């Protein structure tokens, strides 16, 4: 069938591209494979042998090398490597398996769910169908992935097309502690055809390795973009201020009973409130001496050497005297609320008057939006 050609083309043109097989081979001839090794010179008795240069000596092959890989059989392409491009990824040598180690970058995100979602979204972005998947086993098996390349094109006839069809299996394995895992990949089906005719190709181990590494690197590159977006979004969330209210305690109504303790109520989950206090406390002139997130405890010292209190309280007497204190965090009535208590060094609640006096300056710093770095 005659193809439609622009009128500007006055002569027929035929273009030829190198085939995938030819790209593996060195340019030029391979007559060197037929060259025979010449015997050494025979030196007559009584004469000295000439000095031979060893500059161009070819080293002997080791026991694992294949001495048949010469000429057209020698693959000249540089080896591919697994590239840990995404945040929290690195490569561990593990024999012949193709995998990349992935560490969690957000303790609030389930690592296995993140990896599984990233792989599915990557395949969808490339219009690659999923044939089967098993979340419990961490397996994702793709449908046939088809790639076509025009090898010979002529304006007067049909194109000669090289087609590559493959199927892959991804395996997500996360360790029981949930902080790290890995993504492994296997090439499970491979077909090649040229001009509609099936080619009987027996892939070498190196060929399989190249294909799987290339696919894995593409998936990791996609993960890199998504993780960068997630990190930026988290920084934005953490930069936003946290509203804080003071809950005033009531004096004891019965002699001998303890008064209700005043505290601050943060409108944020425990972890976010904890992280914000690491920024706010030093700004208030509270030196963080130690901390224990499991117990929700900050051990702090108050020093009157920053000028903060005098500027904040308009030269009034400091609401908190110099010394050692403890700040205790507890979850509120709901997960998105956190109670903050201020105790002395003996873990006794401070007077309600002191807690309420500090509230104004404390809440201003907690509510302040921060710039993203």
Curated annotation (Swiss-Prot):
InterPro entries: BamC, BamC_C, NlpB/DapX. One of its GO terms (cellular component) is cell outer membrane. Gene3D superfamilies: 3.30.530.50, Outer membrane protein assembly factor BamC. A lipid is attached at residue 17 (N-palmitoyl cysteine). The keyword Nucleus does not apply. The keyword Transcription regulation does not apply. Its main location: membrane. Keywords: Cell outer membrane, Lipoprotein, Membrane, Palmitate, Signal. One of its GO terms (biological process) is Gram-negative-bacterium-type cell outer membrane assembly. Coiled coil: none annotated. A lipid is attached at residue 17 (S-diacylglycerol cysteine). It is a lipid-anchor. It is found in: Cell outer membrane. Pfam families: Lipoprotein_18 (PF06804). Residues 1-16 form the signal peptide. Part of the outer membrane protein assembly complex, which is involved in assembly and insertion of beta-barrel proteins into the outer membrane. Part of the Bam complex. Belongs to the BamC family. This is Outer membrane protein assembly factor BamC. The lineage of its organism: Bacteria, Pseudomonadati, Pseudomonadota, Gammaproteobacteria, Alteromonadales. The gene is bamC.
């Amino acid at each position: 069938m005659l193809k439609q050609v622009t009128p500007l083309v006055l002569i027929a043109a035929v273009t030829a591209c190198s085939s995938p097989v030819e790209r593996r081979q060195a340019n030029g001839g391979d007559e060197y494979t037929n060259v025979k090794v010449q015997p050494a010179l025979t030196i007559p008795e009584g004469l000295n042998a000439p000095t031979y240069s060893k500059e161009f000596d070819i080293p002997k092959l080791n026991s694992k090398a294949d001495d048949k890989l010469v000429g057209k059989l020698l693959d000249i392409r540089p080896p591919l490597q697994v590239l840990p491009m995404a945040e929290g990824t690195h490569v561990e040598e593990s024999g012949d398996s193709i995998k990349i180690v992935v560490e969690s970058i957000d303790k609030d995100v389930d690592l296995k769910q993140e990896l599984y979602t990233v792989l599915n979204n990557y395949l969808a972005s490339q219009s690659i169908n999923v044939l089967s998947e098993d979340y419990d086993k961490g397996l994702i098996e793709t449908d046939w992935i088809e790639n076509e390349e025009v090898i010979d094109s002529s304006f007067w006839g049909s194109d000669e097309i090289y087609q590559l069809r493959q199927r892959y299996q991804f395996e997500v394995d996360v360790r029981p502690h949930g902080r790290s895992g890995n993504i492994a990949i296997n090439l499970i089906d491979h077909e090649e055809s040229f001009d509609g005719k099936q080619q009987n190709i027996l892939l070498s181990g190196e060929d399989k390795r190249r294909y799987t590494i290339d696919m894995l690197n593409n998936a990791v590159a996609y993960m890199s973009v998504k993780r960068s977006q997630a990190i930026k979004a988290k920084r934005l969330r953490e930069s936003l201020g946290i509203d804080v209210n003071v809950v005033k305690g009531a004096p004891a109504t019965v002699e001998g009973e303890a008064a209700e303790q005043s505290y601050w109520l943060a409108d944020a989950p425990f972890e976010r409130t904890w992280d914000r206090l690491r920024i706010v406390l030093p700004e208030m002139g509270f030196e963080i001496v130690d901390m224990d997130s499991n117990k929700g405890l900050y051990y702090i010292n108050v020093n009157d050497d920053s000028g903060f209190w005098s500027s904040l309280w308009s030269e009034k007497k400091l609401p908190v005297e110099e010394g050692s204190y403890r700040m205790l965090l507890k979850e509120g009535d709901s997960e998105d609320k956190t109670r903050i208590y201020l105790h002395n060094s003996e873990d006794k609640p401070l007077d309600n008057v002191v807690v309420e006096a500090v509230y104004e300056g404390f809440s201003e710093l907690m509510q302040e939006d921060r710039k993203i770095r």
